Amino acid sequence: MVDPGPITPGQVSFLLGVIPIFVGWIYSELLEYRKSWVPLKPHSDNNLVELGDVAEKDDDKADLLEGGLARSPSVKFHNSSIRTNIIRFLSMEDSFLLEHRATLRAMSEFGAILIYFYICDRTELLGDSTKNYNRDLFLFLYVLLIIVSAMTSLRKHNDKSPISGKSILYLNRHQTEEWKGWMQVLFLMYHYFAAAEIYNAIRIFIAAYVWMTGFGNFSYYYVRKDFSVARFAQMMWRLNFFVAFCCIVLNNDYMLYYICPMHTLFTLMVYGALGIFSKYNEIGSVMALKIFSCFLVVFLLWEIPGAFEIFWGPLTFLLGYNDPAKPDLHRLHEWHFRSGLDRYIWIIGMIYAYYHPTVERWMEKLEDCETKKRLSIKAAIVTITVLVGYVWYECIYKLDRTSYNMYHPYTSWIPITVYICLRNFTHQLRSVSLTLFAWLGKITLETYISQFHIWLRSNMPDGQPKWLLSIIPGYPMLNFMLTTAIYVLVSHRLFELTNTLKTVFVPTKDNKRLFSNFIAGIAIALPLYCFSFVLLQIHR
C-alpha cells in the first residue's frame, strides 16, 4: 500500500522551479536546431559568421573532451551578474538559452531523474514485491560478478609513488576505488536480498568507507594544504547536493540516508583538525596533539552519558529521524546509533594517512632486500596478519549482531588493517585492480541513495526500503536484471550530473562569485518556498 504523504511546500517549490528549466532547455534545443539548419547564402558575409560559429563549437567540443562541461558553462555563466542572468532566463532570451544549453540540459535531466524517483517509490504506476534471501543464489551472483570482472577488467597500473618515484603503489587510488566497489556490491545485495546473516560484514564495510573518509581527506589536506572556501564548498556539494533534493522531492528526513550525514560530519572533523593552525601541521608533536584532540572530542561526545543529546539536541531538526515502523524511538536515536558505530575509525584513517609515506619507504626498502630475506619478512607479516584476522573472526565477528555492535567501534580497525596488509604484501597485488569494481566504486554515493527509490521501495515518507521495485511482476530474476540495469545507469548519470553542475555553480578560485551564487540560490529558493506554502494553505 503506497502512502505518498501530504504534498509539501518543498515538493511544490521543486515543480515550480523545474518546469521553467524544462521549458528553457527544450526551447534552447529548438533554437540550436534552427540555427544548425540555416542555409548558407552564396557570396554572403553571414557565411563567415556561420564558419566562426562552427569553429567555436569545435572549441567547445575540445573543452568537453578535456573536462566535461567544466569550463564552458561556468565561465559563460558569470560573464554578467547573477541578477542579469536570472532576468535573461525568465525572459527566455535566445542568446542566453543557447549559451547555457548544456547547463539547462543537465538541470533538466537531474529534475527528470528525481521525478522518476517519485514515480517509482510514491505512486502505484509500478508495483512492488517482497524480498527473498537464498544463500546459494546470493553467492552465485556475487562470485559470478567477480569472475566476469576478473576476465574482462583486470588491469595492471604503472603509477609511480609521489613520495619516492618508484612503483610502490601502496593504497593507490585504483585499489581504494576497487575496494569501495566490491564492498558496495555486497552492501547493495545485502539490502536487496535481505541477507541478514552478513550484517556484521556490512558494519565493517561501512566502517571501511568512513576509514577512507579520514584517510583520503587527511591525505589531501596534508599534502595540498588547500583549506579554501571553494574546496570546502565543492566537498559539501559532492556529499549533499543530490541527497538534499531527494529529501525535498520525496519528503524524507536527512537521516534516512545516514551515510551522507556521517561522511559529512567526519569530513568536517578532518577539515577542522587539519585546518586549525594548519601552518604547524608539519610538526610531529602538533599533529600528535591534534589526533589526540580528535580522540578526546569523540570520547567526550559519545562515551559520556547525556553529552551526545546535549550537543546534538539543537540540530534535531536536521539530524532527527523517526522510522514509521518504530515511532517510540527518540528522534536522535538513529543518529546516535549510526554515528556511534564508526566514531573512532575516521581517526584511524587519519593516522594511517599520516604514516603512509613512512610505510611506503619501509616497503621500498623491503623490495630492495635480497630475495630470501624479503620472502621471509613477507611470510612472517602474512602469517601474523592471518592469525590476527582469525582470532578477530572467532572472538568478535561470530558474535550476534547486538553483541557485535558493542565491540565494533573499538575493533573495526582490525579487519580493515588485515585487508590492507593482504592486499598490498606483493608488488603484483598492488599494481593490479579490477576496473569494473573501481568504476562502481566511483559512484557509491549515488548507488547508495538511489537504491532506496528505484531499486527498492519504501512506499512512504521516511520509510525503510522493505520492498523491491517490480517492473516485471512474476519474473523475479528478469525484474532484478532490468531494475538493476536502470538503477546503475541512473546512478552513473547522477554522478556525472552532480559534477557537471558543481563546475557551473561552485567556482574553484573565485570566492566572491561563489558567495553570489549562494545568495542567489537563497534568493530564488526562499520566495519559491513561501509562494508554495501560501498556495497549499489556500488549497487546504
From Swiss-Prot:
It comes from the Eukaryota. Probable O-acetyltransferase involved in the acetylation of xylan during secondary wall biosynthesis. It holds the Pfam family Cas1_AcylT. It comes from Arabidopsis thaliana. Its main location: Golgi. Its EC number is 2.3.1.-. Glycans are attached at residues 79, 424. Disruption phenotype: No visible phenotype on cell wall acetylation in single mutant. Severe growth phenotypes (e.g. dwarf and abnormal flower organs) associated with reduction in the secondary wall thickening and the stem mechanical strength in the quadruple mutant rwa1 rwa2 rwa3 rwa4 and characterized by reduced xylan acetylation and altered ratio of non-methylated to methylated glucuronic acid side chains. Absence of interfascicular fibers and xylem cells differentiation. The triple mutants rwa1 rwa2 rwa3, rwa1 rwa3 rwa4 and rwa1 rwa2 rwa4 are also dwarfs with abnormal morphology. This is Protein REDUCED WALL ACETYLATION 1. InterPro entries: Cas1_AcylTrans_dom (IPR012419). The chain crosses the membrane at residues 7-27, 134-154, 182-202, 203-223, 235-252, 257-277, 291-311, 377-397, 436-456, 470-490, 518-538. Keywords: Glycoprotein, Golgi apparatus, Membrane, Oxidoreductase, Phosphoprotein, Transferase, Transmembrane, Transmembrane helix.
